[in-house]
Amino acid sequence: PSKWERIMGNVQRFKSFDNCEVNYHATINALNVGYMLDIIDNADCPFGLDNLVYGDNEIYSIVSVPPEIREQYLAKYYLDYRKETDAIITYLENIEYDETQMTCMLQDIKDRDKYRGTCLIDLFPEWRNYYEKL
């Protein structure tokens, strides 16, 4: 797993250099797609929400987000609308759900959680019903 404290320490160090510009670019995936407002609200430098995990059999793509969770995410984006999230709203509204792909993604996460000693639902509780069914 990434050592985020170390990574963010390096980000702050690079930001202190006069000849260095730091930007955040989130890779939008099935797990973080509902949390882009957090990036907008907490980015202390320019950011981009322009990278999307996408492709055939790409288990972490938005096709793995079930309708119930999409509705939760969309409700957040509608309630606290920002122009920067227009593409994300469109993805959540229009990309077709694939239950098989979601199951593969959650199995991959469950295997990783076992290896790392972590648990998906500690960070993303909205996935509980799906994660615990495996």
Identify the meaning behind each predicted range.
Residues 1-134:
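Radical SAM enzyme [4Fe-4S]-AdoMet core and its adjacent flexible, acidic
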